[in-house]
């Protein structure tokens, strides 16, 4: 503290003239943005003219400028972002599923479990996303629907690959992508290859379970069908989990995944019914009735049927 009448010490933010005649020169209160923090905020780097920033790393300029509404309607932005973000999540789901597939082929099951769990959480995220789109009313959607043309989520090539990778194969679903040879090649490759569940069935055989040869070497372009020898293997796993712990955990991860996938499908059809009722879909399908039919698809049939047998 300075004696009354003395000038303020050097460096004090108050001028000497202001300090004179006071009982004491008070220390200036801390104010964000004061001198000393002008060059940086809490030691954070603020100059990115010569280094990579957050936006640079995430390519935000490209992502945030990828929304191009075709209608004057305010709600179209929601519709676009809902579907774009869903495609990003599906990209990650495919990435994780293919990583898990490689792990199963090499008998590295613990890493596969982690990746499968992540896919299930991604699907839960996609389920919650329908709550946002559900804020769109029928009248709001009707205002922008004419601008969509024939475009439809039915044509999502990432979703189609996800279905194929999970075993719901249908060669007719290649046709919507025939106009894009590069995309068609990707989707066809997924159709032609064993599904994730096919590789798990092969894993059962490698672990000594007597799986029918016709199940181990089949037409991979066909959807998964129930097989008695596969169910018998899962029955043994569930009856003696301690002896087959990795396979037991694999079974439960797959059930979790299909459970989440079913919830996503259900929220999809419910949202469609809420917004457009039973109108035909923009892609030419029957809309909600088509989506309801998809609710009956079972991806891993033996894992569900074995619960009745236990």
Swiss-Prot record:
Q: What class of enzyme is it?
A: oxidoreductase
Cofactor descriptive note = Binds 1 heme group per subunit.
GO BP annotations of the record are: L-tryptophan catabolic process to acetyl-CoA; L-tryptophan catabolic process to kynurenine
Listed binding positions for substrate are: 79-83, 141, 145, 282
Instruction: Tell me the segments the record calls region Disordered.
Output: 1-39
Q: Catalysed reaction(s)?
A: L-tryptophan + O2 = N-formyl-L-kynurenine
One Pfam family named in its UniProt record: Trp_dioxygenase
Q: What cofactors does the UniProt entry give for this protein?
A: heme
Tell me which UniProt keywords the record has, alphabetically: Dioxygenase, Heme, Iron, Metal-binding, Oxidoreductase, Tryptophan catabolism
Q: In which pathway does it act?
A: Amino-acid degradation; L-tryptophan degradation via kynurenine pathway; L-kynurenine from L-tryptophan: step 1/2
Which amino acid positions bind heme, per UniProt? Answer: 268
UniProt-listed PANTHER family: TRYPTOPHAN 2,3-DIOXYGENASE
Subunit info here reads:
Homotetramer.
Name the family the entry cites: Belongs to the tryptophan 2,3-dioxygenase family.
From the Swiss-Prot or TrEMBL record, give the protein name: Tryptophan 2,3-dioxygenase
Specify the species.
Burkholderia multivorans (strain ATCC 17616 / 249)
